[in-house]
């Protein structure tokens, strides 16, 4: 890492067989507002030498050692045979994704639920074609250990995105300590 450079936040995307739309929408949102590296089975792309985020989508991972890793569990989620995760990893999942919830619980990592119900940690209290209101319904800690208190943040949308992609991007920004950027960026 370059001296003085911010460490790359790694986002590992698991599950979601046959659903490429969710990841492409998430990529679009992140790419507009920060620098990313995309790492997949057959591809590697990086916007710069030291990107803000590395999105890793590889099947059959057996071990993740990246510090402060974010594990995004998409549906449908098939429980991996064996995946060792760092203790400080954070799982992002829909509250309806019961397979992922059980797997995250067994792995012993922190979970943040994303969805449209009152039981979700991060939700949208409203959404239209050009705006949404993000609602952090309970306090969480970002990857640096800072507490993020419950808050509602108005978001500006450049186009219509599915709610899960918006929530994933917002969770990634929030966990990386960039929750304030959500008020200024265009999704």
Can you say where each PLM-predicted feature lies in the sequence?
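Phosphate-binding loop of NTP-binding sites
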Residues: 1-91, 99-110
């Amino acid at each position: 890492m370059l001296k003085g450079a911010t460490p790359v936040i790694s986002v590992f995307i698991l599950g979601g067989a046959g659903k490429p739309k969710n990841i492409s929408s998430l990529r679009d949102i992140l790419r507009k507002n920060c620098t990313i590296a995309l790492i997949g089975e057959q591809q590697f792309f990086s916007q710069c030498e030291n990107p803000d985020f590395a999105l890793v989508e590889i099947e059959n991972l057996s071990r993740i050692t990246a510090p402060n890793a974010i594990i995004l569990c998409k549906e449908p989620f098939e429980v991996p045979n064996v995946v060792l995760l760092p203790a400080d990893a954070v799982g992002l999942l829909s509250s309806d994704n019961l397979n992922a919830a059980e797997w995250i619980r067994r792995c012993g990592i922190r979970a943040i639920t994303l969805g449209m119900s009152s039981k979700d940690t991060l939700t949208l209290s409203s959404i239209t074609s050009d705006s949404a209101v993000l609602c952090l319904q309970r306090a969480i800690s970002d990857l640096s250990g800072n507490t993020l208190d419950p808050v509602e943040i108005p978001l500006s949308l450049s186009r219509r995105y599915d709610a899960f992609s918006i929530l994933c991007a917002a969770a990634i920004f929030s966990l990386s300590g960039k929750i304030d950027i959500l008020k200024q960026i265009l999704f």
